[in-house]
A protein has these predicted regions:
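A short, charged helix-loop
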Residues: 127, 132-138
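Stable alpha-helical elements in mature extracytoplasmic
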Residues: 66, 70, 74, 78, ...
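Surface-exposed patches in mature extracellular/periplasmic domains of secreted proteins
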Residues: 1-11, 84-85, 89-95, 126-129, ...
Length: 219
């Protein structure tokens, strides 16, 4: 896919980032606390907006993987831009129809960007925190968990069916992934496998994610 020319805008504070795109403030309110520190930018049609590198580093917690996830945020935004080109209609810009579409498939668009960028390799500590906060996550993940847990669906697919299947799923869309991505079993059994996968990720020394590469695999 030809992504065309893109400008990258670095912001010197979260307030500047929010002022540039009101969608960010709304998405932050819709996101679970365990994932909010990783909401550091947005992908427009011709621009990527992200916090400056020093601010990304400052947002990292002292747990393993946090800094790596934040440093990969620009790659995730590039993947998010590519996904929006293939699956149009998600915010930004913000509008009623775009918001409705995002609410229904946030796990897919945010999770695919996370997996393609390589962030899923470093998500274990954040997943552990999420599993100890609040109710058990839904399957597929609700919007509040999309930024953190969406990538684990693609990670499970890559482990079971291979990376090519996971990359193909990013092209095909959310309905196709759930209906045909895991052949030979129903959605309920896929949910059970996903919950087991989350539990393994949350274990000390648990497996890291299998991550795609946004620049070379999304085409």
């Amino acid at each position: 896919m030809d992504l065309g020319e893109l400008s990258v805008v670095l912001h010197g504070s979260p307030a500047q980032l929010d002022a540039a795109q009101p969608w960010i403030a709304l998405q932050r309110r819709l996101t679970a606390p365990a994932a909010r520190r990783y909401l550091v930018g947005w992908a427009g049609e011709r621009e990527l907006h992200v916090l400056a590198p020093r601010l990304l580093a400052q947002r990292a917690s002292n747990v393993e993987g946090s800094l790596e996830m934040l440093m990969l945020a620009p790659s995730a935004l590039l993947a998010r831009h590519a996904l929006a080109r293939r699956h149009p209609g998600f915010p930004p810009p913000l509008g009623p129809l775009r918001l409705k579409r995002w609410m229904g498939a946030a796990w897919f668009v945010e999770g695919a960007a996370q997996w393609l960028s390589g962030q899923t390799r470093h998500v274990r500590p954040a997943v552990t925190r999420r599993l100890h906060e609040g109710r058990a996550p839904a399957f597929p993940p609700r919007p509040a968990d999309a930024l953190l847990l969406g990538g684990t669906v693609f990670d499970l697919l890559a482990r079971e069916e291979g990376e090519r299947a996971a990359v193909a799923a990013t092209r095909d869309g959310p309905a196709q992934l759930l209906e045909r991505g895991f052949p030979g079993r129903g959605l309920r059994h896929t949910e059970d496998a996903w919950r087991s996968h989350l539990s393994r990720l949350a274990e000390p020394g648990g497996p890291g994610g299998r991550a795609g590469r946004a620049g070379s695999r999304f085409s």
